[in-house]
Amino acid sequence: MIPVDMAAEIGTAINMGRKITGPTRVVAPPKDFPSGEVLGDKIEKWAVGITIAPRKEQTYNITVDSFLDAGWDSIHLFCEPKVIVADKHSYLPITRRKKKHGAWANWLASLKDLIDIYPDADCYGLIQDDVIFCKGLREFMEQTLWPSGDTGICSVFVPSHYTRNNPGWHKTNRGFKLWMAQTFFFTPESARSCANYEFCKNWNKQKQIDNVVGRWANETKQYPYYFSPSLAQHIGDTSTIWSEGNRAAGKRAASDFVGE
């Protein structure tokens, strides 16, 4: 859960900035100083999906439960073949792929589907099936998005080597070297830009969602912002695309997750 003292500190920093609804010239903040502004209107319509693939140890149930406990009332399930949806989640909107897409193709197709199904959303989010979230996250994000006029993506999960000392949204532009696509939330304009970007549409490998999106963000100047401390944690022990053992460790895990 988001600590009260941290929320107050971040809220103070945000209230020091101006709320802007139109385009604005953005000056990059110092490396370890977070954005102190909230741009645009409050998010009221969310369109969030989760990409789900078969695993030896299925974690998607944990992720969906944690996401709903964090304040949302729905999430769209995008399921690869052979995924078994729990009875308790059968009421949620589900898109089942007729044939195996693979990680990247399912991710990009899911982003396009979200835009088509929920065309008037204020925020588009895609999360992966091996994450947990802190409680109160939805309300917190509605109070703090978007952190800058050049925001393309916001991630509430922060890999350990992206951790910053000062709490808040930090610009984290790494181009094709961007790490971890567990919790990407897009502005409506950025979601459409990413879904239709030629490099993204032409990427034909199964892996590297984070790298591809990072390159799009860098080339279009719609940058990633990662929140410190991490408001989500990577929990997956088995990967559907990587051969090594526990992905959710070291740099692939948050070192400062605030807890559920």
How would you name each of these model-derived features?
Residues 4-6:
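Extreme N-terminal basic, low-complexity initiation segments
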Residues 10-13, 17, 22-127, 131-260:
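An acidic/histidine-cluster motif and surrounding catalytic segment
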